[in-house]
Amino acid sequence: RIYQLERNRMFSYGKEIKMALYTSEDLKKMQSWPLERKIQVTQTRIIEWYQHWEGKVYVSFSGGKDSTVLLDLARRIYPDIEAVFVDTGLEYPEIRAFVKTFNNVTWLKPKMNFKQVIEQYGYPVISKRVSRQIHDVKKHGENCWAWGCFNGREKGFLNMEKWKPLIEAPFKISDQCCNVMKKKPMKEYGKKTGKKAIIGTRADESQQRVGTWLKQGCNAF
């Protein structure tokens, strides 16, 4: 079960309970800041991360708007900072062409292509969260926690009753596509080089990202 208790500033994931660093009001206040202040605070966080890891960092670069803004802000401070792009084979040609316009970009490739991933693990459907819960119910049946997302027990964004028919889908479903094709190459690169990634995400993109930000803020050391 995932919930937040604003008064006590607690956040719970399953049986694990951690104190949150911020409240939803903190987030709303920061989101209302003028652009200049947001840029200043963001670059301060980049400097903190860079210094904490003694410069052994890189920008995780997908060619999308969020990581492009991040790379621009980072290179205003550290012009030679490396960017790392994972070429999954699923990117639009325009994205690949756009990434090639930047210098000092390391291109990585996953060891498995998309066809191999869906054959071994299953299709990603709806979202990673939905795919994960469907996979767990398919594998473990009604005795697992995920079943509560489909029988009405869980509420809010955890209620997935409308996707319940997918449990009976005649094909495998999994959330492993992103892990295998994007996260794993990045982790292997980090292990090989000793570098830590700078990742640009927006809290307003999902409830999960809001929860992550409430718990740890912008940087997670």
Q: What are these regions, as identified by a protein language model?
A:
Residues 11-221:
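ATP-dependent adenylation/nucleotidyltransferase module used to activate substrates
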